[in-house]
Every structure is written in structure tokens, then in C-alpha cells.
Amino acid sequence: MKQEKAYYHLPGSFEFYELYREFLPLFRTHREYFYDWCDIGSIYGAPADCVWGGGRAGFGEHDPKEVLALTREYGISARLTFSNSLLREEHLSDKKCNALCALFERENQVQSGIIVNSELLMDYLKTHYPQLYFVSSTTKVLTEFQQLRAETAREEFRYVVPDFRLNKAFGELDSLPQAQKDKVEFLCNECCWVGCRDRKCCYENVSRKNLGEACPEHICTAPGAEEGYRFSKAMENPGFIGIRDIQDVYMPMGFSNFKIEGRGLGSALVLEFLLYYMTKPEYQLHVREAIYLDNMLDLF
């Protein structure tokens, strides 16, 4: 069933609070700047020093109540990224993470969600915070289509983020029933090498760091790894999903959810994602001027 609206799930609710505090009013008051076929489905993230955290080592410092107040004001779902894959029973009693879940369950008028990897954690959360919904994390590295089919069939998950290497498996993706298509949340702008075999190890390294374990730094051996993340490089990735792909392929096929990564990047690059994926080209300069660009700004 063709979808009329694409929903973006945006990075850095804690990490880029100041950016969203400027961007969201603009998105509401100047809707003509932005594509009418897209909207914001959620903003995800986690504060620093959360043992349940995963995917990226969290560095967000903003007050959780202010984060929730901002998402509530604009009717956006807030998600906690609690995708640590190595949790043990003793970690479930962590006071900080439990307090965050209680807050997100209690105070957000739009239902909040948790991005999870650990079955142990999800079982605990279902019992203690039943009003939260669950997102199956891309850190599970679901690279086989049958894994994705099975995961989207699970009632526990409202959304499932597959590995980016399944993004272009169109024949198999189109075979999913509509109810399962509605759950698939594609990771659009991944820069990871398509031939990487260490992706799960990379995520596990982050999980160990968030648990406070002493561990060696994961060394990425992908071609060009020394350059770090570059959006131009991500656009050349075989799994990259651009705006034309979303409009011309995914939405007609019945898919409507798209995740933008970027929690570990800088706010300037995250703004470029918002410009590319959401903003009409003729208004991109207007958005830059509203957020940071003025006639006295020096770059050097």
C-alpha cells in the first residue's frame, strides 16, 4: 500500500537539544520551507554515562525534563537509546536508567519508546514500564532477510531497524505483509563499509565502555576509515537511501519509517541531514540563516 507520508526518526535528543530548540519552531511556523511528504516520527538519544546505553557512547548532558518538554511541545515521540547488548541481571537496578524510563513513561503526552538490543532488558522494561514501546536496534546487525521477517513478526516491537545492508533487498522487502512493512525503520545515511564483518564487535565495544569495563579501543579496518564520517561518502554507500529513493521506491512499496544516524557527530553535520532530508532546496539557506548564519560569522 503506497504511503503518503514518510516519518523521520532523528538523532540526538540529549546531544543536540540546542539544535532542535531552534529547528522545531522553524519546522512548525515555516512549514512551507519543508517537504510536505515528510514529518518527524521521533527524536532519539541518551544522556552520558548510561550503563544501558549502546550504539554510541553517549555524551548528551541536557536535562531530561527539558528534552521531554521540547518533544511534548511539538507532539513528537521521545526515545531512549538503551541498546547495550551485554547487560546482566545486576545492571537492571541501575538508578539513573530506571529514573529516565519512569520519567519518559510518566511525563510525555506522546508515547515514548526505548531502542533495545537486550532481551533481558526488554523483559524487565515490559514489566516495570508497560506504557513504553520498543524499537529493535540496528545494533543486532540483522543482515539476513529471514531475521528481519522474524523480528518484524514479533508483537513486542513497534519498529525494527535492520542492518543497512538489507536496504536494497527490494524483492524480499516487498514480500512482507503491510503490517510488517509498517514496522521497518530503514537506516538511511550509514557510512560503514558495506563489506564490514566487524559491525557487531564495534557495537559490543561501545556496550563494554558504557558498562565501565576496561577494553581496548575498537580499530576500524574499513577502507578510508581514517577519514571518519563524511556525508558525501555515505551517499556513495550502496545502502544509502536518498530522498528520491524514499519518494519513488520505498513509499510506493508501502514503507514509511526512516532513521537518520548521527548521535556521535557534530551538530553542523546533523543540520545538513535535516536540510537534505527535510528541507526544500530553495529554502535551505533560509534555514541556515535562521539557525546560525549571519552577516558577521567568520569561519576562519
Language-model-derived ranges and their functions:
Residues 1-151, 156-300:
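Active-site pocket-lining/capping segments in soluble small-molecule metabolic enzymes
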